[in-house]
Amino acid sequence: MIQPQSRLKVADNTGAKEVMCIRVLGGSNRKFANIGDIIVCSVKDATPGGVVKKGDVVKAVIVRTRKGIRREDGTYIRFDDNAAVLIREDKTPRGTRIFGPVARELRDKDFMKIVSLAPEVL
């Protein structure tokens, strides 16, 4: 469950290391985001020479949360950290690599490029 002011790790190679959620997209008064939701973020920590730099405002899709998500068969999937992947306006990832596992729910939400780049889909 991600809300404004939440900090997330960045699970791609765009150069950003940490982002802070500043808005949850998908409704005028939406308060929380979960796996597969798009958020607007500010880059808080970045490596030199990356695609993005500190202070940039970017869009990202959440790929892992500590809260987890309930599946149709009644099982829950939870992760060790909160992580996001930076995306462009057309929902394609800005980076060329994805680090760490991602949830299978991204496939249902049309983030096929992220699912195909991920080393593990849980």
From Swiss-Prot:
It comes from the Bacteria. GO terms for cellular component: cytosolic large ribosomal subunit. Part of the 50S ribosomal subunit. Forms a cluster with proteins L3 and L19. In the 70S ribosome, L14 and L19 interact and together make contacts with the 16S rRNA in bridges B5 and B8. HAMAP family: Ribosomal_uL14 (MF_01367). SUPFAM superfamilies: Ribosomal protein L14 (SSF50193). Belongs to the universal ribosomal protein uL14 family. GO terms for biological process: translation. Pfam families: Ribosomal_L14 (PF00238). Binds to 23S rRNA. Forms part of two intersubunit bridges in the 70S ribosome. InterPro entries: Ribosomal_uL14 (IPR000218), Ribosomal_uL14_bac-type (IPR005745), Ribosomal_uL14_CS (IPR019972), Ribosomal_uL14_sf (IPR036853). One of its GO terms (molecular function) is large ribosomal subunit rRNA binding. Keywords: Ribonucleoprotein, Ribosomal protein, RNA-binding, rRNA-binding. This is Large ribosomal subunit protein uL14.
